[in-house]
Amino acid sequence: MITDPLKTVHVVGGGLAGSEAAWQIAQAGVRVVLHEMRPARMTEAHRTEGLAELVCSNSFRSDDAANNAVGLLHAEMRKLGSLVMRAADANQVPAGGALAVDRDGFSAAVTKALAEHPLIELQRGELDGLPPSDWGHVVIATGPLTSAPLASAIQALTGEDSLAFFDAIAPIVHRDSIDMSVAWFQSRYDKVGPGGNGADYINCPMTREQYEGFVAALISGDKVDFKDWETNTPYFDGCLPIEVMAERGAETLRFGPMKPVGLTNPKDPTVKPYAIVQLRQDNKLGTLYNLVGFQTKLKHGEQSRIFRSIPGLENAEFARLGGLHRNTFLNSPKLLDQQLRLRAEPRLRFAGQMTGCEGYVESASIGLIAGLYAAAEARDIALAPPPSTTALGALLGHITGGHIETIDAGPRSFQPMNVNFGLFPPLESPPTHGADGKKLRGPDKTVAKKQALSARALADLDGWIAENLPGAAAAA
């Protein structure tokens, strides 16, 4: 039995993030109590009492560290001794270039490793309110299906608008894939908001024929069904899926997110667009733009097809496609500090999907970082954040401050995000020529840029590990 509350970290939630956090803390020599409410209280989605149970897909997505941001995240986590990645590698099933796992074997491996660790105590039972005040170091990683009593307690502590119970996600496009020979920068009525200059949006014009074809495609496109535990997820008028708006009438979108008023196309100022799609800057780096009002339940293939019919987005590269799911997540940029601590009560640290990351690997990676921070704090050691040039640092930066909220974005403009190269700081000297000396163009230029970002990330992570976590460097 673990009895020292001062040097003990309590981790609440035995999913991917909580399991990874507990492992990292214990591996750093700090005692852990891992609290998991299953099987005493099950969720609508879980079917076992196993830790790190995968409730949806069994895929961890691409394992290509050189060309894919999530593959890079895999590599970084392996360098840091991730339990989740170790269990995934040991239970891999064939999936081409992706890392997919035997879900039961994966969960069993994580559960066994945590149960057998001498510094980890597993307690089964629901936490029905905020952690007791004598728990000095806490990581809350209860995920998208956080129990109602705990969610209510967190909301009471942080404020009414601090916690969301569903996500309404609009697609996000890489800025450099937008055709600016068609699109232009302008805010509606040239309005200047905080930090803006009156030209803060990218605008894509449509003719009547293009608009009517677009609306028809939205209505006829294949939609994703709600999962069983999402069937009562409410639609709010401020976050209606765009295809639902289209179904309400042919002109609904023209009087909603696609209204053409207050905007003039400088490329053809005498012609009034019939409708306009606006994209708003999504990150401080200015590398990502979201389609305003385009939250959707369309299937991903349909989104790519339909949204690339928008003038200026014919070759759009999507950093994230849209969706609407049941979820529980914080308005993290406002509520959490750079070490994932709750500003209102710093003994509480959050991790995983609750912080506003999306995806198995992303959740586990934030659990990893939260675990490292919690262990360092329990040992009275200062830990520098991972470099923003790494996948871990880029994702952490987005959660804790990289997102921007414009004056008209609404109180819930922060939405969950997968890791993607758009979150990374730009290269100081992007590659311009290939190994053969020829000038890089088109897809070759994009591939070279991604590979350069990955190489920089891994080199910078090695330096950070050597300086801050010498034990991990020795193990690697």
Swiss-Prot record:
It is found in: Cytoplasm. FAD binds at residues 13-18. The gene is trmFO. GO terms for biological process: tRNA methylation; tRNA wobble uridine modification. Its main location: cytoplasm. It comes from Rhodopseudomonas palustris (strain BisB18). PANTHER family: GLUCOSE INHIBITED DIVISION PROTEIN A (PTHR11806), METHYLENETETRAHYDROFOLATE--TRNA-(URACIL-5-)-METHYLTRANSFERASE TRMFO (PTHR11806:SF2). This is Methylenetetrahydrofolate--tRNA-(uracil-5-)-methyltransferase TrmFO. GO terms for molecular function: flavin adenine dinucleotide binding; tRNA (uracil(54)-C5)-methyltransferase activity, 5,10-methylenetetrahydrofolate-dependent. Catalyzes the folate-dependent formation of 5-methyl-uridine at position 54 (M-5-U54) in all tRNAs. Transmembrane segments: none annotated.
